[in-house]
Design a protein with these regions (language model features):
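Short linear capping/connector segments at secondary-structure termini
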Residues: 28-32, 90-91, 157-165
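Short coil/turn linking the two alpha-helices of tandem helical-hairpin repeats
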Residues: 146-147, 153, 195, 215-220
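Conserved, well-structured interaction surfaces
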Residues: 41-45, 50-57, 79-149, 165-178, ...
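Aromatic-lined, polymer-binding surfaces characteristic
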Residues: 151, 155, 198-205
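Bacterial Sec-dependent N-terminal signal peptides
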Residues: 1-28
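Short, solvent-exposed turn/loop segments enriched in Gly/Ser/Thr/Pro and often Arg
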Residues: 62-79, 153, 199
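Acidic, glycine-rich segments characteristic of secretory precursors and extracytoplasmic regions
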Residues: 19-66, 174
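TPR/Sel1-like alpha-solenoid repeat signature
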Residues: 135, 206-212
Length: 221
């Protein structure tokens, strides 16, 4: 009987210790429950760093020429990508049926930052600066989507695979451009004029706003 009780106690201890191990945070993903409450300025900067190579081709290399992107995105021009000169000559060239531009991971990541960054213990100056970068990236990504697709769905919050908003229709180009310009205005307010080398500044946001204004003005003409 005594041996049975000892075995039972040992088994209980193993079960309790196993629960502690199962409750540990994943090492390869950001936990929304704890990341933002402990994210210092360096962590916010690293979060922003994810979007520089995604949206700014050749970022960090003043001599970079992204030839692959120039070729693969030729479908955006009147000279559609062809397998050879003969395909154009004999009218056999066809449009690409798919591409990676209809992707919403950047928008989702930006919305997650904007929804949670105020929880960070970083200084208000750092929080505003990095929020300005994220606002710029969200506006820039949407600007590119409008240039490619026209009407697109506008999302203001991070969604998961079960969110019903994933199945919403496209918002009109006019509505989306108004939201883009509003986002850029907030980025201009948050971003400093002088930044580290290769980081988004207020002047970059002003340039993006000018490009957005051109689209709005052209559409109204």
């Amino acid at each position: 009987m005594k041996q049975y009780i000892i075995s039972l106690i040992c088994s209980s201890c193993l079960l309790l210790s196993s629960c502690n191990y199962l409750d540990t945070e994943p090492g390869d993903a950001i936990s929304s429950d704890h990341f933002w409450e402990t994210a210092n300025a360096a962590a916010l900067e690293q979060y922003c760093n994810l979007y520089y190579p995604k949206l700014i081709k050749g970022h960090g290399d003043p001599l970079a020429w992204n030839i692959g992107s120039m070729i693969s995105q030729e479908y955006q021009s009147d000279n559609l990508l062809a397998s050879g000169a003969s395909a154009i000559t004999f009218g056999q060239n066809t449009k690409l049926t798919s591409n990676s531009d209809w992707n919403w991971s950047t928008v989702r990541g930006c919305n997650a930052f904007l929804q949670n960054y105020q929880k960070s213990p970083a200084s208000e100056m750092d929080k505003k600066k990095y929020a300005g970068e994220i606002l710029f990236f969200k506006a820039f990504d949407y600007y590119n989507k409008v240039c490619l697709f026209g009407d697109v769905p506008w999302y203001d919050s991070p969604l998961d695979k079960n969110s019903p908003e994933l199945y919403k229709g496209r918002d009109s180009r006019t509505v989306v451009m108004a939201s883009i310009l509003k986002t850029i205005d907030q980025a201009i307010e948050f971003l400093p004029r002088k930044t580290k080398v290769y980081r988004v500044s207020r002047d970059a946001a002003l340039l993006l706003k000018a490009r957005g204004d051109v689209i709005v003005t052209w559409k109204e003409m």
